[in-house]
Amino acid sequence: MKIVDLLGGKAEYYLNHTCKTIDKQLIHIPGPDMIDKVWMNSDRNIRTLESLQALYGHGRLANTGYVSILPVDQGIEHSAGASFAPNPLYFDPENIIKLAIEGGCNAVASTFGVLGAVARKYAHKIPFIVKLNHNELLTYPNSYDQVMFGTVKEALNMGAVAVGATIYFGSEQSRRQIVEVSQAFEYAHELGMATILWCYLRNSSFKKDGTDYHAAADLTGQANHIGVTIKADIVKQKLPSNNGGFKAIGFGKTNECMYSELTTDHPIDLCRYQVANGYMGRVGLINSGGESHGESDLHDAVVTAVVNKRAGGMGLISGRKAFQKPMKDGIQLLNTIQDVYLDSSITIA
């Protein structure tokens, strides 16, 4: 099915939108020359540049500047039973790797246990991204905190080219997490690895008057900006669903131009604001695919990919939509996401 058909009645809304907030000429648009154009002038060492090129240079999107990553850390983050019950095949780590390879992904991101179980067989066949920290839901009552499950050196020794970590910005533990992840990323760069940060918000006060601002463009944009400050090479963020979190909750510092000139209510403009907060796209923005909703997954994934690409983002990191269904359907979904980035007619807004 063609991309335009999957978008349905809103195809023109997404495909023909012109961004009049932050001009595309200001954005470092992903392309085959990302290493030379962006990272060559940075303080990243030669080995880290090699690791970034390994990510950029694998899978169906190889050497386009875009990335498609399969993340499967939900066995810890959301519990293994809840995550894999729809398709028990993925209790076995090898099938996670097979989905990423057969799905044409640039890389697979998962836990120390998952990747370590099959590292000798697969680390040279697809780039590994080891997730350093997790929140687990077996503590009662549930507490939301990211804790380290292993070390950067362990990730290096299993052949990983990159490490990933989550910070719950806005949470009581966020400042400790910032310090921990900053130190881990510094060491990863020293060892020649790339770094990816899950820049998530977590605070019950971010829900106000029936509106959830955990995906507000202004709040997520600032989370991204802190993330690139501690030298994330790629930032993972939820696609913005609203704006004005700072104003609604009544905290932080704002400028009215953030809302009147730099954003509108169009999802591409809201995502463009996220991209801008990653040093105008120098640090690539990958948006998350979100939970699986069944029949609408393909449509939802294509919408997210189109918004991300047209905003100036670098790609999609889609897990549950891909692995909570038969493998052939998961492969089809991943390939369809990649088709958006391979389609030259889908341009930067």
Locate the predicted segments by residue.
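Glycine-rich beta-strand-to-loop/alpha-helix junction loops that act as flexible
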Residues: 285-291, 318-321
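Short, highly charged low-complexity linear segments
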Residues: 2, 130, 345-349
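N-terminal amphipathic alpha-helix/helix-capping segment at the start of soluble metabolic enzymes
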Residues: 1-78, 83, 116-125, 273
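Hydrophobic alpha-helical scaffolding
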Residues: 42, 264, 294-295, 327
